[in-house]
From Swiss-Prot:
Protein name: Small ribosomal subunit protein uS5
Organism: Anaplasma phagocytophilum (strain HZ)
Gene: rpsE
Annotated GO biological process: translation
Any matching Pfam family: Ribosomal_S5
Domain topic, free-text comment: The N-terminal domain interacts with the head of the 30S subunit; the C-terminal domain interacts with the body and contacts protein S4. The interaction surface between S4 and S5 is involved in control of translational fidelity.
Length: 173
């Protein structure tokens, strides 16, 4: 009896793009010596406002990447974009020693972000954004800080409700 080891993909998984953020070789010291394995961090997105991150661990990089992609697909979140090109409002978030500042930008600015933050915005579908990493630039903590920022962002409807205005007044600023 053979077992199919291929990852299962759903119909919507075909239009997802994935980027490898980091690969780390970790070791566990056992009685016979060191046992090496790999830890992989991947971001996955549909380039239309949905993005997810996942981490996979395995003895081989390819298997770790498959695990990471599956984990990323499971925890995808929706990010509200203005005109499908930038963030609706500026946001700051912190995770461990990493702090990220994400700012919306004018048309033609591009993705001004360093390291692992750029990968998130590329798979998210953002064209104009400015991002700054303050503190630790460890890829894992920076990615989790960015996702914390995305989760704290408000939709235009929520912003309009807080301000007591119409959604069209909030969007057309």
């Amino acid at each position: 009896m053979s077992v199919d080891r291929k990852p299962r993909t759903s119909n919507d998984a075909h239009d997802l793009s994935e980027l490898l953020v980091s690969v780390r070789r970790v070791s566990k010291v056992v009685k016979g010596g060191r046992r090496f394995s790999f830890s992989v961090l991947v971001v996955v997105g549909d380039e239309k406002g949905r993005v997810g991150c996942g981490m996979g661990k395995h003895a081989e990089v390819a298997e770790a990447k498959i695990k990471a992609v599956n984990a990323a697909k499971k925890n995808m979140i929706r990010v509200y974009l203005r005109e499908s090109r930038t963030l609706h409002h500026d946001v700051t978030a912190k995770f461990c020693a990493s702090r990220v500042i994400l700012r919306s930008a004018k048309v033609g600015t591009g993705i001004i972000a360093g390291g692992s933050v750029r990968a998130v915005f590329e798979v998210l579908g953002v064209q104009d954004v400015v991002a700054k990493i303050v503190g630790s630039s460890n890829a894992h903590t920076v990615i989790y800080a960015v996702f914390s920022a995305f989760k704290s962002m408000l939709s235009p409807k929520q912003v309009a409700g807080k301000r007591g205005k119409k959604v069209c007044d909030v969007i057309n600023r």
